[in-house]
Amino acid sequence: MQLLTIGINHHTAPVALRERVAFPLEQIKPALVTFKNVFLGPQAPNTPEAAILSTCNRTELYCATDDRAAREGAVRWLSEYHRIPVDELAPHVYALPQSEAVRHAFRVASGLDSMVLGETQILGQMKDAVRTATEAGALGTYLNQLFQRTFAVAKEVRGTTEIGTQSVSMAAAAVRLAQRIFEKVSDQRVLLIGAGEMIELCATHFAAQGPRELVVANRTAERGQRLAERFNGRAMPLADLPTRMHEFDIIVSCTASTLPIIGLGAVERAVKARRHRPIFMVDLAVPRDIEPEVGKLKDVFLYTVDDLGAIVREGNASRQAAVAQAEAIIETRVQNFMQWLDTRSVVPVIRHMHTQADALRRAEVEKAQKLLARGDDPAAVLEALSQALTNKLIHGPTSALNRVNGADRDSLIDLMRGFYQHAPRSNDQSGH
């Protein structure tokens, strides 16, 4: 079985493409079934395995398969599933085989490949991806072992380095950008759309600035109400957004909607009602919640996750020593995992050897039992049994030695000496 990771992320693709390749949570299980069965070869000697990790910054397919053409098949499947031409998608896709796939998984879970260096949210997202793959019946021995090692490495990296300390989160970056637009965030009205982990982080950071008002709008009213109350804010129905948008100076949105929830027309009306006072908008969702055309309006300052990434990277340089430590830990653990993977490759061979040897044993025992039943001398029967087993067990190695020549034969001889520890060397004339 070969490990393979196929994907795109914030390093290789803009948000405009990432949002088209993202998988809504409810689509992942059925997608895994088609991906595993159609493109990883259901007739393969070993059952193929697959997992999908889809976040705002990356979409990745983790595979374990015998199919040597899995790389091309995975890219083609991703293209067809999302109805994106292969020629448009392929230049942004990375394909990581074997140790590269292992190293990548370890780095992703440890926060080394994130836009926010050392962030912890990705680890929870990977665990969710594994849980979903397990429920879909798409996870097996290889990927299960990979992810368990991945989580252990992430824990080790975060526990022994300072990779996650003083990191600038997306939420903190949003506040910093708001401070560039408005002299005092404390004088502004803030609207947060959504009620997930990212919006919760934004609520924490914006509430710390003491805004004039903090309001949460969410599709599920009860959840939005609970979040608003935690930060002494108010909740409002998401349906009221088009008619009340003009009330807010700062709008941050991050929902799981597959389509934009804030359109150009609604923002145009809000700007007009505000008499062209500026609106600061942050779209942290992938796919995007706010139509990109909104950013072209004169009095609107619209930022996406990619825009916030530049601010986040400013805080990453100071933690390069921790990065070096983390990379060293990861490299050691990659080698450990590859050793385990190598041992797995010989398991079928060992199993076959046991099966063959046992078949020989049973055949000879059955023959011996028949001889004993007809009254043959037990000592002679046992001698014949042992001779037959000896001849048949060494037949394979002997035939192999006779078939090869030159350096191959010398290598095989050395290998056989390892099997039979007491085999005499060719220059040993002692006769022992």
Swiss-Prot record:
GO molecular function: glutamyl-tRNA reductase activity; NADP binding
CDD domains: NAD_bind_Glutamyl_tRNA_reduct
Comment text on domains: Possesses an unusual extended V-shaped dimeric structure with each monomer consisting of three distinct domains arranged along a curved 'spinal' alpha-helix. The N-terminal catalytic domain specifically recognizes the glutamate moiety of the substrate. The second domain is the NADPH-binding domain, and the third C-terminal domain is responsible for dimerization.
PROSITE patterns (alphabetical): GLUTR (PS00747)
Key word NADP present: yes
Protein task: Catalyzes the NADPH-dependent reduction of glutamyl-tRNA(Glu) to glutamate 1-semialdehyde (GSA).
Amino acids binding substrate: T55, C56, N57, R58, S114, E119, T120, Q121, Q125
One GO BP: protoporphyrinogen IX biosynthetic process from glutamate
Catalytic residues (positions): C56 (nucleophile)
InterPro entries: 4pyrrol_synth_GluRdtase, 4pyrrol_synth_GluRdtase_dimer, 4pyrrol_synth_GluRdtase_N, GluRdtase_CS, GluRdtase_dimer_dom_sf, GluRdtase_N_sf, NAD(P)-bd_dom_sf, Shikm_DH/Glu-tRNA_Rdtase
Catalytic activity: (S)-4-amino-5-oxopentanoate + tRNA(Glu) + NADP(+) = L-glutamyl-tRNA(Glu) + NADPH + H(+)
Identification of the protein by name: Glutamyl-tRNA reductase
Pathway: Porphyrin-containing compound metabolism; protoporphyrin-IX biosynthesis; 5-aminolevulinate from L-glutamyl-tRNA(Glu): step 1/2
PANTHER family: GLUTAMYL-TRNA REDUCTASE (PTHR43013:SF1)
